[in-house]
Amino acid sequence: MDQETTDQFNESDEEKLIEPYNYIVQNVGKKFRSSLIEAFNFWLQISDDKLRIITNIIEMLHNSSLLIDDIEDNATLRRGQPVAHSIFGIAKTINAANYIYFRCLNLLIKEFPEEIMPKAVKIFTEQLLELHRGQGMDIYWRDSFVCPSEQDYMDMVQRKTGGLFGLGVKLMQLFSTDQRNFSYLIKLLGTYFQIRDDYINLKSASVSQDYF
């Protein structure tokens, strides 16, 4: 991850904070989200440096969200390894994940041109709200023993998985002349991969395996 630190906080202290995050990124997944962003660049045609920044933001958000997911799901394994909170504790893992969320926002603020900053922050906020709405409803149904309707489930899936997809594409469009609305395609992709992930979790002998 980006090693730049603030004047008030040195690199050594930061490394102590983000040990759970560094632990999970050592055992990387397939980086599907990065591949998807690169695929969209076939149409959007943004520069390599901007693409690199956006890809980094999405991967950081995804990996930090996994730290929280494992706590919320009472998981014991992630990608075949013990979950971070079983090693570093719940409190430190939550703090590390939240810290990375704000590091992503800070990276966006530092690297994006000032003239598009308000739009970028608005997109960042809206898409993370969508992600947490989807995750929140998923948790609510699970803990309340409520079986959602098919439409409610589809809405949850599109928020939960489509949030990061949408964030990446919309940030890219801030630097692109292609302003077509990709929302429907993003929703379809999010729906496909979340349903596939849920199905694999139900059928797999190892429900903790992370496939994406």
Q: Language-model features: where?
A:
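Mg2+-dependent prenyl diphosphate-binding active-site environment of isoprenoid biosynthetic enzymes
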Residues: 11-212
